[in-house]
UniProtKB/Swiss-Prot annotation:
<dbReference type="InterPro" id="IPR012340">
    <property type="entry name" value="NA-bd_OB-fold"/>
</dbReference>
<keyword id="KW-0227">DNA damage</keyword>
<dbReference type="GO" id="GO:0006281">
    <property type="term" value="P:DNA repair"/>
</dbReference>
<comment type="function">
    <text>Catalyzes the formation of phosphodiester linkages between 5'-phosphoryl and 3'-hydroxyl groups in double-stranded DNA using NAD as a coenzyme and as the energy source for the reaction.</text>
</comment>
<dbReference type="GO" id="GO:0003911">
    <property type="term" value="F:DNA ligase (NAD+) activity"/>
</dbReference>
<dbReference type="InterPro" id="IPR033136">
    <property type="entry name" value="DNA_ligase_CS"/>
</dbReference>
<dbReference type="InterPro" id="IPR020923">
    <property type="entry name" value="DNA_ligase_B"/>
</dbReference>
<dbReference type="InterPro" id="IPR013839">
    <property type="entry name" value="DNAligase_adenylation"/>
</dbReference>
<keyword id="KW-0235">DNA replication</keyword>
<dbReference type="GO" id="GO:0006260">
    <property type="term" value="P:DNA replication"/>
</dbReference>
<dbReference type="InterPro" id="IPR004150">
    <property type="entry name" value="NAD_DNA_ligase_OB"/>
</dbReference>
<comment type="similarity">
    <text>Belongs to the NAD-dependent DNA ligase family. LigB subfamily.</text>
</comment>
<dbReference type="InterPro" id="IPR018239">
    <property type="entry name" value="DNA_ligase_AS"/>
</dbReference>
<dbReference type="InterPro" id="IPR010994">
    <property type="entry name" value="RuvA_2-like"/>
</dbReference>
<dbReference type="Pfam" id="PF03120">
    <property type="entry name" value="DNA_ligase_OB"/>
</dbReference>
<keyword id="KW-0234">DNA repair</keyword>
<dbReference type="InterPro" id="IPR050326">
    <property type="entry name" value="NAD_dep_DNA_ligaseB"/>
</dbReference>
């Protein structure tokens, strides 16, 4: 077993180091950054435990707390976990300590942990607040908040008002101590779609209120531990269900390996449940005697949390891109995070104005999720660094008629035009994207957006970053492009018309297009006066005329005199 534990620790350490790189800060800056985040988390803790309020989403709090711990370890500071524990206004001792649960990084780590154990069961990791329920002589004698695991606050009066908690029990439960989760009741909660809804904070708020309102009936309880209870899990579940704790039996499943856990975890992630969850807990039926339970020392259970719907990511750099139309967009380069099995390292912020409204700088922590079609998006800026240096955006000198010809200032828009003309809906140049175009342009110094038509097989073969086998295919693609219809080439030149309007125009030659009048363009579908002015300006542009003449010299269909 020691060998397997060593392997497990090695894997966890490797994963931690691969995703959590230490910041390159001076000692002074590290102290400032850590102190600021520590103060903020302490403020959130005070709001949460003293007033039952939460100014931050549960998931954001958890991730920023983990980030603080990471920074503290990076710079040799103590983690001070006690700072994140609730203040003990009361000091009621738990009959049995709350151990907490160690989290597994992934399925591999879980598999290694399970390999050395038997009689294993999986339960949902219900998202609420932990509680101890003490029954004496068949009656609810005391309810204690988790607190620091050893002591908590007296919640007895509050819990007695929660109708979902049995006030009387019998049989083996008559004199028992139970541990569980007070949760917010939900009807058909689908975790994948609805997320955490800040359930933990909402429960804490209800439990902290001074008034004993009917809203406590919106709470339920999920018992996940019966210290010193029956040895067989099936017996435990049966007795709990008979007493009224039916959810425990319904949502506790026997499992033999990590594959089975993964299937249950995925099912609970996607199906309707009566509570919010943030993962699953795998536990061995065999537990030590309760007198040996201590916070942080439970070896008989582990958690495998869901990947958060939104992840906190550090902004590593701010980059500017110029699109084919000349619009400047801003992109944030991120320390990699995983979202729904997708590694995210970049997120589009939008326009320069939007970036300025977000006020994002390198070193900030932003909340990122996936929008439709798996596209990363920014949900919020959750933490701003102490030192914030924002880059200066490029001058807004570009428009839809600039950068058909290469120049130093036109680098980004020029590349964007190449990417556009190579796309499936234009010339359909398979096998080349932005990186390939950059390599070709840097090596062969294109004059304009169609210069690639002159490249020889030898030139393509000698282009850095393009394999010999791929260079032959690319040359073939470039030659096939010569056979594309006239309208595709006009689209590649950036005519400000939709494909439908262009096809309806029935233009089949460059000379005919140049002679078309304003009245002709106005007859096309979806072409208003503003669009017509853009077309006239486009076809009269000197760069466009020069490109048309060049394509005629290359005998491209529709451009020949």
């Amino acid at each position: 077993m020691k060998v397997w534990m060593a392997i497990l620790i090695s894997i966890l350490c490797w994963q931690s180091s691969s995703w959590a790189v230490c910041p390159a800060w001076s000692p002074a800056r590290a102290q400032e950054e850590i102190s600021r985040l520590q103060q903020q988390i302490k403020q959130w803790d005070d709001d949460y435990w003293k007033e039952g309020k939460s100014e931050v989403e549960d998931g954001v709090y958890d991730q920023l707390s983990a980030r603080l711990t990471q920074w503290q370890r990076c710079f040799g500071e103590e983690t001070h976990r006690d700072a994140m524990m609730p203040p003990l206004n009361g000091a009621v001792i738990h009959p049995v300590a709350h151990t907490g649960v160690r989290k597994m990084a992934d399925k591999i780590a879980l598999s290694l942990w399970m390999r050395e154990r038997s009689d294993l069961w999986v339960q949902p990791k219900v998202d609420g607040v932990a509680v101890t329920l003490v029954y004496r002589d068949g009656k609810l004698n005391k309810a204690i908040s988790r607190g620091n695991g050893l002591k908590g606050e007296d919640w007895t009066q509050k819990v007695r008002l929660i109708s979902a908690v049995p006030q009387t029990v019998s049989g083996p439960l008559a004199n028992s101590t139970l541990q569980g989760e007070i949760f917010l009741k939900r009807e058909g909660h689908i975790q994948q779609q609805m997320g955490g809804i800040n359930a933990r904070a909402k429960v804490a708020d209800l439990m902290m209120r001074q008034d004993d309102s009917d809203t406590l009936n919106s709470l339920g309880v999920f018992v996940w531990a019966w210290p010193d209870g029956p040895q067989l899990m099936t017996d435990r579940l049966k007795e709990l269900a008979t007493a009224g704790f039916t959810l425990t039996q319904t949502y506790t499943r026997a499992v033999k390996n990590a594959d089975e856990v993964a299937r249950v975890r995925n099912a609970w992630w996607k199906t309707k449940l009566p509570f919010v969850t943030d993962g699953v807990v795998v536990r061995a039926a065999k537990e030590p005697e309760s007198r040996h339970w201590l916070p942080g020392q439970a070896e008989w259970l582990v958690a495998w949390k869901y990947q958060p719907v939104a992840q906190v990511a550090e902004v590593k750099a701010i980059q500017f891109a110029v699109g084919k139309s000349g619009k400047i967009s801003v992109v944030a380069s991120l320390a990699p995070v995983m979202l729904d099995d997708k590694k995210v390292q970049r997120v589009n912020i939008g326009s320069v104005r939007r970036w300025q409204e977000w006020n994002i700088a390198p070193g900030d922590q932003i909340l990122v999720s996936l929008a439709g079609q798996g596209i990363p998006r920014i949900d919020d800026v959750v933490w701003r660094g102490a030192e914030r240096t924002k880059p200066t955006p490029p001058e807004n000198r570009f428009n839809s008629l600039t950068c058909y010809f290469a120049s130093d200032v036109c680098q980004e828009q020029f590349i964007s035009r190449l990417v556009w003309l190579g796309s499936k809906q234009v010339l359909g140049l398979d096998g080349i994207g932005e990186a390939g175009w950059r390599s070709l342009h840097q090596t062969h110094r294109f004059e304009h957006i169609f210069s690639w038509l002159l490249l020889t097989p030898e030139q393509l073969q000698n282009t850095p970053g393009i394999a010999k086998s791929k260079s032959a295919q690319l040359w073939h693609q470039f030659n096939l492009a010569r056979q594309q219809p006239f309208t595709r080439w006009v689209m590649a030149m950036g005519i400000p018309l939709t494909r439908a309007a262009l096809n309806a125009s029935d233009e089949r030659s460059w000379s005919q297009l140049l002679l078309s009048t304003e009245q002709f363009w106005q007859q096309l579908p979806g072409t208003g006066s503003g669009r017509v002015r853009q077309v006239i300006e486009w076809k009269e542009n000197a760069q466009i005329k020069k490109l048309g003449s060049w394509l005629a010299a290359q005998q491209i269909t529709g451009f020949e005199p």
